[in-house]
Amino acid sequence: MKSVFAFAFVCLPLAALAQDGIPNPYGAPQHQWASPASGAWGSSAGIERGPRGEIWAIDRCGANSCDGSDHGPIVQLDLATGKAIKSIGAGLFVFPHGLHVDRRGNVWVTDGAISKDGSKGLQVTQLSPDGKVLMTLGVAGQRGNDETHFQSPSDVITAPNGDIFVADGHAAIQPFIPANLNMRVMKFDSQGRFITQWGKPGARYSEFNNPHALGLDSKGRLYVADRGNNRTQIFDQGGKFVAEWKQFGRPSGFYITGDRLYAIDADSSEANHPGGWKKGVWIGSISEAKAEAFVPDEQAGEGVVVAPDGNMYGAVNVVPRGITKYPKQASREKRS
């Protein structure tokens, strides 16, 4: 823990975050690489790797919503061909947004919108790999800010002991965020019982503006993609603030393996961060709190994962919607 607090309050100036000349260990992005089960890939905000190396991704039913669709929006991909092996979750979701595969291979999905008839949406659902519903959190079609409701859950992740963390607050309104919007992280035990929560609208430590994605490192620290505030916030699992990082862009999604952090930036622009970052994927060392590589992509997505073969994949929610493949070029990566 000593190394954690050594970097807890480090915020690097933009001059230290130069993107020109930083190593890029991947080849040119291959957009619309995969073929979905629905025939035409819809918006995708999530892509995840399971415990056996399997890759799952979100396909919003060939559109940007699954309301009224009979397609299964959670797709397992064959990395050799880019084709769908199977799809699950048909009829369960309206706006599948956050995706997580736990240590047993079960698939977790957050649903960020309400169906037209008000009967579905705004829940977190755990599915077996075959699509059986194992658990749901939240009340279908009902917004709220108490312990049993969500306003717009954006992501979910589970700890090794089974505890569940949910980012609730898929909205980014600047420069002012209405006080009645949920901008929080909620924690539940493995049975779905509420434990605690933290966060509120704002830009100070432990405050959020669109907590868009979650990650856990090897030491159990929780990473929150505080996208509307152009930063990553790090906490212990009880909600105690540990660090603020601004050297990994305006993050929409994370992939963490060992000491490596991959943070995908789908949202940076002159409008929301003048003179700042470009869109793409930041890669770096967690222990050194340092961005060491950058993969530029003006069509970067909101989810990112690295497959067992070393290739990286992104989930893209806008044109060109679908899955992007970034082929690994190991010889080009430089370590410091």
Regions found by a protein language model. Name each.
Residues M1-V4:
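Positively charged n-region of N-terminal signal peptides that target proteins for export
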Residues A6-A15:
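Bacterial N-terminal signal peptides
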